[in-house]
């Protein structure tokens, strides 16, 4: 894993093992995704397995600061003046924000890594049109409301529907056999 060794020079120098962080774990998973050229469909399936549970935990464990981050991302997502890159960044921030609100270090690391891969594979102006933006904004607001209300069941159910619908719509819009994250053809 990256970032686990700290090399110090000098008289008291040497190689020192550092405690792994969420960031180092996310970097390792991200390197695996890029290095193994994991297919976007595999990332989406993993996302469908993890994100509903993140939303459930977020509803149980969220803080006011977590809600403020989700609200900030929701505002950016709903901005009609946002270009594709701004929208995708806000979308990524919201999804990572849900995992952060779960307060589960492993889920946070996985979601950071998955979100970066999904972002790279879905940067497609033909797919992310105004209708997709509106549906995304509505879904995020509904999930955030369930998290705010500490309704874990509703948060998980809404997130499951959201990520599944997004995966289905993406698959319909792109009929290539596979999109490989890390492929120069998909904006790496």
Go through the PLM ranges and name each one.
Residues 36-37, 123-126:
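Short alpha-helical transmembrane interface motifs in multi-pass membrane proteins
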Residues 1-50, 56, 60, 175-188:
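Short linear motifs at protein or domain termini
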Residues 131-133:
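Hinge/beta->alpha junction and helix N-cap segments in small-molecule ligand-binding domains
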Residues 43-124, 136-145, 154-169:
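Conserved amphipathic alpha-helical segments that form helical-bundle/coiled-coil interaction surfaces
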């Amino acid at each position: 894993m990256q970032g686990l060794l700290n090399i110090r020079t000098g008289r008291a120098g040497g190689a020192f093992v550092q405690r792994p962080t969420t960031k180092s774990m996310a970097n390792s998973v991200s390197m695996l995704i890029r290095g193994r050229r994991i297919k976007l469909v595999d990332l989406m399936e993993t996302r469908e397995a993890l994100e509903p549970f993140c939303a459930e935990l977020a509803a149980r464990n969220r803080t006011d600061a977590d809600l403020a981050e989700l609200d900030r991302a929701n505002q950016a997502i709903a901005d009609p003046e946002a270009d594709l890159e701004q929208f995708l960044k806000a979308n990524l921030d919201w999804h990572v924000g849900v995992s952060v609100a779960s307060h589960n270090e492993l889920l946070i690391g996985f979601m950071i890594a998955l979100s970066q891969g999904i972002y790279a594979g879905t940067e497609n102006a033909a797919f992310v049109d105004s209708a997709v933006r509106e549906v995304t904004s509505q879904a995020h607001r509904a999930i955030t409301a369930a998290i705010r209300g500490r309704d874990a069941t509703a948060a998980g159910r809404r997130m499951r529907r959201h990520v599944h619908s997004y995966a289905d719509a993406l698959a319909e819009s792109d009929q290539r056999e596979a999109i490989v994250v890390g492929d120069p053809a998909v904006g790496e």
